[in-house]
Amino acid sequence: MAFTLYTLLQAALLCVNAVAVLHEERFLSKIGWGVDHGIGGFGEEPGMKSQLMNLIRSVRTVMRVPLIIVNSVTIVLLLLFG
């Protein structure tokens, strides 16, 4: 299998899909990455864990509709061109 731009884009799509399907109550809270209401204070930098949780929430919120469209296009292309 050749390493092409399409393969790279497909791998990126799979990674974004993996982040988008993480469920906060079923998976993330079991490993201790649930919602923390008391994170940080005034003038404190957020930690790495809170930044990763913010990234996961942002990807799930912002990328929901574009992921549906891109996944549909990818499925159609795979069905048409194998």
Curated annotation (Swiss-Prot):
The keyword Transport applies. It is a multi-pass membrane protein. GO terms for biological process: brain development; endoplasmic reticulum to Golgi vesicle-mediated transport; organ growth; positive regulation of extracellular matrix constituent secretion; positive regulation of protein secretion; protein transport. Pfam families: Yos1. It is found in: Endoplasmic reticulum membrane. Keywords: Endoplasmic reticulum, Membrane, Protein transport, Transmembrane, Transmembrane helix, Transport. One of its GO terms (cellular component) is Golgi membrane. The chain crosses the membrane at residues 2-22, 62-82. The keyword Endoplasmic reticulum applies. Belongs to the YOS1 family. Regulator of endoplasmic reticulum secretion that acts as a key determinant of brain size. Required for secretion of extracellular matrix proteins. Required for correct brain development by depositing sufficient extracellular matrix proteins for tissue integrity and the proliferation of neural progenitors. Acts as a regulator of the unfolded protein response (UPR). This is Immediate early response 3-interacting protein 1. The lineage of its organism: Eukaryota, Metazoa, Chordata, Craniata, Vertebrata. The gene is ier3ip1.
